[in-house]
Amino acid sequence: MKPVVLTFLALVMSARAVATQRPPASATRPPFTIVVNNANPVDTLTVAELRRIFMKQQRLWAHGDTIVPVDWDAASQMRRVFSQIILSRSVREMAEYWVQQSVTQGLAPPSTLSSGVAVARFVATVPGAIAYLPPDAADRSVKRVRIDGLPVFPAQSR
């Protein structure tokens, strides 16, 4: 009986030690970075706010500017990942959402661009713009925004 209890305690302690270890920085890095125009005072957004913004349920920034979300082309991997993680929908489900919004609310989907350079250039020149970029594509022409509530992602193998 005593060896069973000791084995159980050892397992519990090992599990606790593993659970309290922080994952390496690469494991927590999201597959995209949210960016806004440098003049935008926003520093942090929640996943729920991003969802409302990219589904055009929130159309104004707190400081009064119109929000201009920019998406990637529907065929891009960036768009698929962003849609799944932030919008909790596939690209196809989002296309269906926009058909419904167009008919019932008169809303058009966000504009789409096909490259990180084009997305960054657009965000840098449009005051209310918001978009997502690969983490290494966000340069000083745009402002990175912290995402509160984003889940931890495993490191990607290269």
What do the PLM-derived regions correspond to, one by one?
Residues 5-14:
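Bacterial N-terminal signal peptides
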Residues 16-19:
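Sec/Tat signal peptide C-region and signal peptidase I cleavage site
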Residues 21-158:
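Exported/periplasmic ABC-transporter solute-binding proteins
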